[in-house]
Amino acid sequence: MAQGILGKKIGMTQVFNEQGELVPVTIVDVAANVVLQQKNVDQDGYQATQIGFCDKREKNTSKPMLGHFKKATTAPKRFIKEINFSSDVNSNLANLVVGALITNDLFQVGDLVDVTGTSKGKGFAGSIKRHNQSRGPESHGSRYHRRPGSMGPIKGKLKGKKLPGHMGYETVTIQNLAILSIDTEKNLFLIKGNVPGPNKGFVMIKSAVKKLTKEQTHAKN
């Protein structure tokens, strides 16, 4: 079943599992998710549910978006994403009306999820740090230590060439993370391991696409 919800990364902590092992977890706040739009194949060419999360002020919202939020009878949202799923896949999101609140009971403890977020920006970095390339020789007479090497043709550079530049601040997805605990009163997910981005960063939590085998699940745990 395809499910999805938006949240904000609170931080990391540690909890004990049933076996008495200390496990690192990430706390994600998933409160106040609102359905903004239901898209279907006939009108939009694909099926998806548009979700909004985290209120923002009206003066920072454009008039077209204010009208969009007014149709959903909700306050303007800062973080908006679409949860896509094919028409033959069962999803509780498709049954919700526009303006409905999405509760945390879409997921259960033990579910595997894919978490998507924006990684931390690390500024300008060279090829060695950014792409894990090897350095040049450092013996006497060598003048090639940390350079990126040949960039290809004289005019322009090859597409996809690994060069120095802005490191981080990219969309990253970590797959098959387990939900260890759900706080229904405070709308918090405790997800095993780390998720992309800094604290207070927005993330999208979706049902895992790739199913793990028993051997892979045992190795992951």
From Swiss-Prot:
InterPro entries: Ribosomal_uL3, Ribosomal_uL3_bac/org-type, Ribosomal_uL3_CS, Transl_B-barrel_sf. GO terms for molecular function: rRNA binding; structural constituent of ribosome. Keywords: Ribonucleoprotein, Ribosomal protein, RNA-binding, rRNA-binding. The keyword Ribonucleoprotein applies. GO terms for cellular component: cytosolic large ribosomal subunit. Residues 123-156 are annotated as: Disordered. It holds the Pfam family Ribosomal_L3. One of its GO terms (biological process) is translation. The keyword Iron does not apply. HAMAP family: Ribosomal_uL3_B. Part of the 50S ribosomal subunit. Forms a cluster with proteins L14 and L19. Belongs to the universal ribosomal protein uL3 family. One of the primary rRNA binding proteins, it binds directly near the 3'-end of the 23S rRNA, where it nucleates assembly of the 50S subunit. This is Large ribosomal subunit protein uL3. It comes from Aster yellows witches'-broom phytoplasma (strain AYWB). The gene is rplC.
